[in-house]
Amino acid sequence: MRPVQPAPEVAEALEGGRPVVALESTLISHGLPRPDNLRVARALEEAVRREGAVPATVGVVGGVARVGLGPEELELLASGEVPKLSARDLPAAAATGSSGATTVAATAHLAALCGIKLFATGGLGGVHRGARESWDVSADLAALSRAPVAVVCSGVKSILDVPATLEQLETLGVPVVGFRSRSFAGFYLTDSGCALDWSVEDEGEAAALIRALPGLGLGCGVVISNPLPPEEQLDPSLHERALRSGLEELARRGISGKEVTPFLLEHFRERTGGESLRANERLVVRNARLAARIARRLAAGR
Protein backbone atom coordinates (compact mmCIF):
# COMPACT_ATOMS: atom_id res chain seq x y z
CA MET A 1 0.00 0.00 0.00
CA ARG A 2 1.29 3.45 -0.90
CA PRO A 3 2.12 5.66 2.11
CA VAL A 4 0.25 8.62 0.55
CA GLN A 5 -3.17 8.12 -1.01
CA PRO A 6 -5.28 10.91 -2.51
CA ALA A 7 -9.01 10.23 -2.39
CA PRO A 8 -10.47 9.31 -5.82
CA GLU A 9 -12.28 12.67 -6.09
CA VAL A 10 -9.07 14.54 -5.28
CA ALA A 11 -6.96 12.46 -7.69
CA GLU A 12 -9.47 12.99 -10.50
CA ALA A 13 -9.58 16.74 -9.88
CA LEU A 14 -5.79 17.03 -9.91
CA GLU A 15 -5.54 14.90 -13.04
CA GLY A 16 -8.11 17.11 -14.75
CA GLY A 17 -6.49 20.37 -13.67
CA ARG A 18 -9.45 21.35 -11.49
CA PRO A 19 -9.02 23.43 -8.32
CA VAL A 20 -8.28 21.60 -5.06
CA VAL A 21 -7.84 23.04 -1.56
CA ALA A 22 -6.06 21.15 1.22
CA LEU A 23 -7.39 21.39 4.77
CA GLU A 24 -5.54 20.34 7.93
CA SER A 25 -6.99 17.93 10.48
CA THR A 26 -5.30 19.14 13.68
CA LEU A 27 -7.99 21.82 13.77
CA ILE A 28 -10.50 18.98 14.03
CA SER A 29 -8.66 16.87 16.60
CA HIS A 30 -7.07 19.50 18.84
CA GLY A 31 -8.18 22.98 17.77
CA LEU A 32 -11.91 22.83 18.48
CA PRO A 33 -13.97 21.06 21.15
CA ARG A 34 -16.45 18.30 20.39
CA PRO A 35 -19.00 18.32 18.80
CA ASP A 36 -18.12 21.65 17.17
CA ASN A 37 -14.98 20.19 15.61
CA LEU A 38 -16.79 17.75 13.32
CA ARG A 39 -19.44 20.30 12.40
CA VAL A 40 -16.76 22.86 11.45
CA ALA A 41 -14.78 20.24 9.49
CA ARG A 42 -17.85 19.55 7.38
CA ALA A 43 -18.59 23.27 7.04
CA LEU A 44 -15.07 23.88 5.71
CA GLU A 45 -15.44 21.21 3.05
CA GLU A 46 -18.84 22.62 2.08
CA ALA A 47 -17.41 26.16 1.89
CA VAL A 48 -14.72 24.97 -0.52
CA ARG A 49 -17.28 23.16 -2.67
CA ARG A 50 -19.56 26.18 -2.84
CA GLU A 51 -16.69 28.21 -4.26
CA GLY A 52 -16.14 25.65 -7.01
CA ALA A 53 -13.16 23.68 -5.70
CA VAL A 54 -12.61 20.18 -4.31
CA PRO A 55 -11.76 19.93 -0.59
CA ALA A 56 -8.94 17.62 0.49
CA THR A 57 -8.86 17.27 4.27
CA VAL A 58 -5.56 15.60 5.15
CA GLY A 59 -4.95 13.06 7.91
CA VAL A 60 -3.18 9.78 8.63
CA VAL A 61 -5.35 6.68 9.06
CA GLY A 62 -3.79 3.29 9.79
CA GLY A 63 -0.36 4.54 8.75
CA VAL A 64 -1.55 5.86 5.39
CA ALA A 65 -1.54 9.60 4.68
CA ARG A 66 -4.99 10.27 3.25
CA VAL A 67 -5.36 13.38 1.12
CA GLY A 68 -9.12 13.69 1.20
CA LEU A 69 -10.97 12.01 4.06
CA GLY A 70 -14.25 10.12 4.04
CA PRO A 71 -16.99 10.61 6.68
CA GLU A 72 -15.77 7.77 8.92
CA GLU A 73 -12.18 9.00 8.76
CA LEU A 74 -13.27 12.53 9.70
CA GLU A 75 -15.16 11.11 12.67
CA LEU A 76 -12.09 9.12 13.76
CA LEU A 77 -9.91 12.23 13.81
CA ALA A 78 -12.65 14.23 15.54
CA SER A 79 -12.80 11.69 18.37
CA GLY A 80 -9.98 13.43 20.22
CA GLU A 81 -8.13 10.14 20.68
CA VAL A 82 -5.46 10.61 18.00
CA PRO A 83 -2.13 12.47 18.29
CA LYS A 84 -0.92 15.47 16.35
CA LEU A 85 1.47 14.50 13.56
CA SER A 86 4.01 16.96 12.22
CA ALA A 87 6.06 16.24 9.11
CA ARG A 88 8.78 14.53 11.17
CA ASP A 89 6.20 12.09 12.60
CA LEU A 90 4.95 10.79 9.25
CA PRO A 91 7.57 8.02 8.76
CA ALA A 92 6.99 6.59 12.25
CA ALA A 93 3.21 6.70 11.78
CA ALA A 94 3.58 4.89 8.46
CA ALA A 95 5.89 2.24 9.93
CA THR A 96 3.65 1.52 12.93
CA GLY A 97 0.29 1.79 11.19
CA SER A 98 -0.75 4.66 13.45
CA SER A 99 -3.46 7.25 12.90
CA GLY A 100 -3.17 10.95 13.60
CA ALA A 101 -4.18 14.47 12.67
CA THR A 102 -1.79 16.44 10.49
CA THR A 103 -0.41 19.81 11.53
CA VAL A 104 0.18 22.68 9.10
CA ALA A 105 3.72 21.35 8.52
CA ALA A 106 2.58 17.83 7.67
CA THR A 107 -0.43 19.01 5.66
CA ALA A 108 1.66 21.42 3.58
CA HIS A 109 4.21 18.68 2.88
CA LEU A 110 1.59 16.12 1.83
CA ALA A 111 -0.38 18.64 -0.21
CA ALA A 112 2.75 19.64 -2.13
CA LEU A 113 3.64 15.98 -2.66
CA CYS A 114 0.28 15.50 -4.40
CA GLY A 115 0.52 18.70 -6.45
CA ILE A 116 -2.04 20.72 -4.48
CA LYS A 117 -1.21 24.42 -4.60
CA LEU A 118 -3.67 25.90 -2.07
CA PHE A 119 -4.12 25.15 1.61
CA ALA A 120 -6.49 26.86 4.05
CA THR A 121 -6.16 26.94 7.82
CA GLY A 122 -6.99 29.19 10.74
CA GLY A 123 -3.62 30.32 12.04
CA LEU A 124 -0.06 29.11 11.56
CA GLY A 125 2.19 27.92 14.32
CA GLY A 126 5.21 30.09 14.93
CA VAL A 127 7.77 31.30 17.44
CA HIS A 128 6.50 30.85 20.99
CA ARG A 129 6.88 33.54 23.60
CA GLY A 130 10.07 32.90 25.54
CA ALA A 131 11.62 30.98 22.64
CA ARG A 132 15.05 32.44 23.48
CA GLU A 133 15.07 30.09 26.46
CA SER A 134 12.91 27.21 25.21
CA TRP A 135 13.80 27.18 21.49
CA ASP A 136 10.11 26.41 20.93
CA VAL A 137 9.55 27.25 17.27
CA SER A 138 6.84 25.52 15.25
CA ALA A 139 7.91 23.21 12.44
CA ASP A 140 5.23 24.92 10.32
CA LEU A 141 7.68 27.68 9.43
CA ALA A 142 10.50 25.47 8.15
CA ALA A 143 7.98 23.30 6.29
CA LEU A 144 6.73 26.32 4.34
CA SER A 145 10.29 27.06 3.24
CA ARG A 146 10.31 23.65 1.50
CA ALA A 147 6.72 23.01 0.39
CA PRO A 148 5.51 24.98 -2.67
CA VAL A 149 2.01 25.56 -1.28
CA ALA A 150 0.14 28.81 -0.70
CA VAL A 151 -1.35 28.88 2.80
CA VAL A 152 -4.35 31.13 3.33
CA CYS A 153 -4.58 31.91 7.04
CA SER A 154 -5.46 34.64 9.52
CA GLY A 155 -1.85 35.14 10.52
CA VAL A 156 -0.35 33.11 13.34
CA LYS A 157 -2.15 32.25 16.54
CA SER A 158 -2.17 35.39 18.65
CA ILE A 159 -0.79 33.50 21.65
CA LEU A 160 2.59 33.41 19.85
CA ASP A 161 5.39 35.94 19.38
CA VAL A 162 4.13 37.45 16.13
CA PRO A 163 7.06 39.81 15.31
CA ALA A 164 9.58 37.00 15.91
CA THR A 165 7.54 34.66 13.72
CA LEU A 166 7.58 37.14 10.84
CA GLU A 167 11.33 37.58 11.27
CA GLN A 168 11.77 33.81 11.10
CA LEU A 169 9.65 33.56 7.93
CA GLU A 170 11.81 36.29 6.38
CA THR A 171 14.98 34.42 7.33
CA LEU A 172 13.57 31.25 5.75
CA GLY A 173 12.72 33.13 2.55
CA VAL A 174 8.96 32.55 2.78
CA PRO A 175 6.95 35.38 1.17
CA VAL A 176 4.17 36.82 3.35
CA VAL A 177 1.50 38.95 1.68
CA GLY A 178 -1.72 40.45 2.94
CA PHE A 179 -5.03 40.02 1.14
CA ARG A 180 -6.26 43.58 0.67
CA SER A 181 -4.25 44.63 3.72
CA ARG A 182 -0.71 45.78 4.52
CA SER A 183 -1.14 44.65 8.14
CA PHE A 184 -0.49 41.08 9.21
CA ALA A 185 -3.68 39.47 10.50
CA GLY A 186 -3.92 38.88 14.24
CA PHE A 187 -5.87 35.59 14.22
CA TYR A 188 -8.80 36.48 16.53
CA LEU A 189 -7.98 40.14 15.85
CA THR A 190 -8.04 42.01 12.56
CA ASP A 191 -4.57 43.48 13.00
CA SER A 192 -1.57 41.97 14.79
CA GLY A 193 0.18 45.34 14.85
CA CYS A 194 2.83 44.12 12.38
CA ALA A 195 3.14 45.76 8.97
CA LEU A 196 3.65 43.85 5.72
CA ASP A 197 5.71 44.93 2.72
CA TRP A 198 3.34 43.44 0.16
CA SER A 199 -0.35 42.85 -0.43
CA VAL A 200 -2.54 41.49 -3.22
CA GLU A 201 -5.82 43.17 -4.05
CA ASP A 202 -7.79 40.26 -5.47
CA GLU A 203 -7.77 36.53 -6.17
CA GLY A 204 -6.21 37.08 -9.60
CA GLU A 205 -3.16 38.81 -8.14
CA ALA A 206 -2.82 36.06 -5.54
CA ALA A 207 -2.91 33.41 -8.28
CA ALA A 208 -0.31 35.34 -10.30
CA LEU A 209 1.98 35.45 -7.27
CA ILE A 210 1.69 31.69 -6.78
CA ARG A 211 2.41 31.07 -10.47
CA ALA A 212 5.52 33.27 -10.27
CA LEU A 213 7.24 31.23 -7.54
CA PRO A 214 8.48 28.21 -9.57
CA GLY A 215 9.50 30.36 -12.52
CA LEU A 216 11.76 32.34 -10.21
CA GLY A 217 13.35 29.15 -8.90
CA LEU A 218 11.78 29.48 -5.47
CA GLY A 219 10.77 26.13 -4.05
CA CYS A 220 9.02 27.59 -1.02
CA GLY A 221 5.43 28.28 -0.17
CA VAL A 222 3.75 31.61 0.44
CA VAL A 223 1.65 32.88 3.34
CA ILE A 224 -1.49 34.80 2.36
CA SER A 225 -2.76 36.70 5.39
CA ASN A 226 -6.55 37.10 5.35
CA PRO A 227 -7.71 39.22 8.31
CA LEU A 228 -11.12 39.10 9.90
CA PRO A 229 -13.17 42.25 9.24
CA PRO A 230 -13.13 44.57 12.30
CA GLU A 231 -16.79 43.89 13.01
CA GLU A 232 -16.11 40.13 13.22
CA GLN A 233 -12.98 40.16 15.39
CA LEU A 234 -12.84 39.27 19.06
CA ASP A 235 -13.11 42.31 21.32
CA PRO A 236 -9.46 43.47 21.67
CA SER A 237 -9.71 44.23 25.41
CA LEU A 238 -11.29 40.83 26.07
CA HIS A 239 -8.53 39.24 23.99
CA GLU A 240 -5.82 40.97 26.02
CA ARG A 241 -7.29 39.86 29.35
CA ALA A 242 -7.68 36.26 28.19
CA LEU A 243 -4.13 36.18 26.80
CA ARG A 244 -2.58 37.61 29.95
CA SER A 245 -4.36 35.19 32.28
CA GLY A 246 -3.64 32.27 29.94
CA LEU A 247 0.08 32.94 29.86
CA GLU A 248 0.15 33.23 33.65
CA GLU A 249 -1.65 29.89 34.02
CA LEU A 250 0.67 28.29 31.47
CA ALA A 251 3.73 29.31 33.47
CA ARG A 252 2.14 28.21 36.75
CA ARG A 253 1.38 24.72 35.44
CA GLY A 254 4.66 24.33 33.55
CA ILE A 255 2.94 23.38 30.30
CA SER A 256 5.20 23.28 27.23
CA GLY A 257 5.63 21.84 23.74
CA LYS A 258 2.67 20.44 21.83
CA GLU A 259 0.31 21.04 24.75
CA VAL A 260 0.69 24.84 24.78
CA THR A 261 -1.60 25.72 21.87
CA PRO A 262 -4.53 23.41 22.79
CA PHE A 263 -4.37 24.61 26.40
CA LEU A 264 -4.42 28.29 25.48
CA LEU A 265 -7.17 27.89 22.88
CA GLU A 266 -9.34 26.19 25.50
CA HIS A 267 -8.45 28.90 28.02
CA PHE A 268 -9.54 31.54 25.51
CA ARG A 269 -12.81 29.70 24.94
CA GLU A 270 -13.58 29.63 28.66
CA ARG A 271 -12.50 33.21 29.39
CA THR A 272 -14.37 34.70 26.42
CA GLY A 273 -17.59 32.78 26.97
CA GLY A 274 -17.18 30.97 23.66
CA GLU A 275 -16.58 34.15 21.63
CA SER A 276 -13.08 33.01 20.62
CA LEU A 277 -14.53 29.74 19.33
CA ARG A 278 -17.04 31.60 17.18
CA ALA A 279 -14.32 33.94 15.87
CA ASN A 280 -12.15 30.91 15.07
CA GLU A 281 -14.97 29.35 13.07
CA ARG A 282 -15.63 32.59 11.17
CA LEU A 283 -12.01 33.08 10.21
CA VAL A 284 -11.30 29.52 9.11
CA VAL A 285 -14.44 29.37 6.93
CA ARG A 286 -13.49 32.71 5.35
CA ASN A 287 -10.00 31.35 4.66
CA ALA A 288 -11.39 28.19 3.05
CA ARG A 289 -13.60 30.26 0.76
CA LEU A 290 -10.75 32.56 -0.25
CA ALA A 291 -8.38 29.64 -0.88
CA ALA A 292 -11.00 28.02 -3.11
CA ARG A 293 -11.48 31.21 -5.13
CA ILE A 294 -7.72 31.59 -5.59
CA ALA A 295 -7.43 27.91 -6.56
CA ARG A 296 -10.14 28.43 -9.15
CA ARG A 297 -8.27 31.38 -10.68
CA LEU A 298 -5.03 29.42 -10.59
CA ALA A 299 -6.63 26.47 -12.39
CA ALA A 300 -8.13 28.80 -14.99
CA GLY A 301 -4.70 30.29 -15.69
CA ARG A 302 -5.78 33.85 -15.01
Swiss-Prot record:
One Pfam match, given by its short name, reads Indigoidine_A
Co-factor: note = Binds 1 Mn(2+) ion per subunit.
Organism listed in the record: Rubrobacter xylanophilus (strain DSM 9941 / JCM 11954 / NBRC 16129 / PRD-1)
Looking up InterPro entries in the UniProt record yields: Indigdn_synthA-like (IPR022830), PsuG (IPR007342)
Q: Does the keyword Lyase apply?
A: yes
Q: Which family does it belong to?
A: Belongs to the pseudouridine-5'-phosphate glycosidase family.
User: What biological process terms from GO does the record include?
Assistant: nucleobase catabolic process
Coiled coil region boundaries? none
Question: Any one cellular component term from GO for this entry?
Answer: cytoplasm
User: Active site located where?
Assistant: E24 (proton donor), K157 (nucleophile)
Please name the HAMAP family in this protein's record.
PsiMP_glycosidase
List keywords of the entry alphabetically.
Glycosidase, Hydrolase, Lyase, Manganese, Metal-binding
Q: What does this protein do?
A: Catalyzes the reversible cleavage of pseudouridine 5'-phosphate (PsiMP) to ribose 5-phosphate and uracil. Functions biologically in the cleavage direction, as part of a pseudouridine degradation pathway.
* Subunit and interaction comment: Homotrimer.
Keyword Lyase (UniProt): yes
The UniProt annotation places substrate binding at K84, V104, S138, A139, D140
Q: What is its EC number?
A: 4.2.1.70
Under SUPFAM superfamilies, the record lists:
Indigoidine synthase A-like
Q: In its UniProt entry, what is this protein called?
A: Pseudouridine-5'-phosphate glycosidase
Molecular function as annotated in GO: hydrolase activity, acting on glycosyl bonds; metal ion binding; pseudouridylate synthase activity
Reaction(s) catalysed by this chain, per the record, are: D-ribose 5-phosphate + uracil = psi-UMP + H2O
Top-level lineage group: Bacteria
Q: Which cofactor does it need?
A: Mn(2+)
Q: Which residues bind Mn(2+)?
A: D136
Q: What class of enzyme is it?
A: lyase
